[in-house]
Amino acid sequence: MIGKIEIDEGKRGRIIDKAGHLADEVGAKYMSCAPATFGAICDAFRSEDIELFPPEIQEAITQGMIGLHGGVAMTGVGTCGAVAASTFLISYVVGVTTEELSKDDNLNYAASVPAVEYIIDRFEEDYGAIDCLRVRYNRVQRAFDLMDPDARILEMTFALYEKDKCGMNAPNFEGGRDQTPPVRGARWAAEAICDLLGMEPEERHELPPHLRGLGSQDMEPKLQKVVEALKELGWGRPNEKISYREYRTFKLKGKKGLEQKRLGSVSAPKGKE
């Protein structure tokens, strides 16, 4: 766990700007949002003598971050790599240990609240999404499944043809590069981390009043009577295990309908031998 570190306004501003510039430079070098965002944030703090990870640990984590690029494994369907990397670092600085979490699972909120406040809400406001495909489409009206080689070619063509719109390595930092998800994610995460480092470690674990008492350890004894009443009513069909594909059949035809063979399960007729 990282202890409290006083960061004055000058140093804070330099860290945030450095994180943004590095995210652009490294993002263009790697063409990979998650490792670029992660590395930019770590190196920005190191430039002001604040080490989040030793270099060898940072390198090891960066290798893992590569798989989170492009909406997880370059498919586009998962979370934006810049969001994932930023959230990872914020959670790390909040510093909830596994031992603490095993005693109070409500501490999941401690790592989540600042990530939502500084990263998720801002991505939703600026890009209308946090998943890779929609972030890219809403930003530049282009989005591809990068596992498709043709789509990869189209993406690179767009990046070279529309440099200012793409943003990577655009001449004007504020007008161009500052638009990109790695840059904004790195800047916003750096801002969050500066604020978190200004707190004592215990303060980072404090929750807003409306999220307190929601851990399973607190709720289970209070909810046990409710659970027993629901079981008596048969609510939720606790003994039924059906897939979402079977749910409509269940509603229309009941359990008997599920037990009947579907058309697709009938064996194909054998051909003449």
Locate predicted features:
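Acidic-glycine-rich active-site phosphate/pyrophosphate-binding loop
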Residues: I2-G13, I41-G67
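A short glycine/serine-rich beta->alpha loop
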Residues: A19-A28, L68-G78, N106, N172-Q179
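Polybasic, low-complexity association/targeting segments
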Residues: I2-C33
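Long, low-complexity, intrinsically disordered segments
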Residues: K253-E273
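Amphipathic alpha-helical interface segments
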Residues: A34-A44, S86-I90, D104-G234, R245-F250
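Phosphate-handling active-site elements
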Residues: A44-T62, Y92-A115
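Short alpha-helical scaffolding segments that buttress acidic/His motifs in well-ordered protein cores
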Residues: A19, A23, T37, I61-H69, ...
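Conserved phosphate/anionic-ligand binding catalytic regions in large, soluble enzymes, centered on
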Residues: V72-F88, E228
